[in-house]
Amino acid sequence: MHPLLVKSFAKINLGLLITAKRQDGYHTLETIFAPINWYDTIEFSDSEKISMSCSNSDLPVDDNNLCIKAARSLQQFAAVRKGIAMKLQKQVPFGAGLGGGSSDAATVLRVLNELWKVNASPAELHALAVKLGADVPYFLSMKGLAYATGIGDELDDLALTLPYYIVTVFPEEHIATVWAYKNFYSRFDRELPDLKKLLSELCLSGKKEGLPAFENDFEPAVFDHFPAVRKVKLTLLEAGSIFSSLSGSGSAVFGLFEREDEALAAMKLLPEAYRKNLTPPGFCMAQ
């Protein structure tokens, strides 16, 4: 086969409400996943064994890497002995709350299901994806906005598009998801907003009154421990963002802007060392 190059897009969380802690230690949540035009690329080539290389030397390329785990899980599921060589060009920051590793794993499952002619059903691929990580099912089966519950693996595809420019900023702080879950300030007894209804009003009618309800429960603890991350949010709001929030467990922060010129101006106000991305209105991963 000729080498195959595939994009793996990242996401932000528009609201992330942690609703309970299960007996197995996992937390349930409600969130809206929104895709952004920030992506890694993976090149797939023929090989007798499963292997990978990565442009970022800080990431492992052994069995601890999610791409390798995804390939091996499909190999075991299908009882095939085929291999693959993967070259990961890492652009999405890791430890940022943008789901870069989960997206890469989903890409591997989807591509190898075709290349190896496994023909696993969507339900079978979903089951493999959940074992790799809570965000992996979103990247496997969704292209645009999605409402997620459970541990993030129960998904409702929303026939909506976000009519705003999204500025996403990585302030060069890596925050482990395990740390975030250990340190967030729990509020399990509150009344929860209807995120789907509020999002529909925002996307279809432009009603912004519900935006404050899209809280991220990791944000208070992250901001207390990482003041540079808090400063990014304040800068985006001062620059005209109609809403700004931490994404996932951080440290990436995003802002919604009504005008492209405001979004571009906001990006220039942030330190040059911070990695930044601009996503246009209505973006979906099928583009």
Curated annotation (Swiss-Prot):
* InterPro entries xref list: GHMP_kinase_C_dom, GHMP_kinase_C_sf, GHMP_kinase_N_dom, IspE, Ribosomal_Su5_D2-typ_SF, Ribsml_uS5_D2-typ_fold_subgr
Q: Which UniProt keywords apply?
A: ATP-binding, Isoprene biosynthesis, Kinase, Nucleotide-binding, Transferase
- Tell me yes or no: is Nucleotide-binding among this UniProt entry's keywords: yes
Catalysed reactions listed for this entry: 4-CDP-2-C-methyl-D-erythritol + ATP = 4-CDP-2-C-methyl-D-erythritol 2-phosphate + ADP + H(+)
Q: What is its EC number?
A: 2.7.1.148
Q: Where does ATP bind?
A: P93, F94, G95, A96, G97, L98, G99, G100, G101, S102, S103
Instruction: Mention one GO biological process in which this protein takes part, according to its record.
Output: isopentenyl diphosphate biosynthetic process, methylerythritol 4-phosphate pathway
- What does this protein do, in the record's words? Catalyzes the phosphorylation of the position 2 hydroxy group of 4-diphosphocytidyl-2C-methyl-D-erythritol.
What this protein is called in its record is 4-diphosphocytidyl-2-C-methyl-D-erythritol kinase
Which gene name does the record give? Answer: ispE
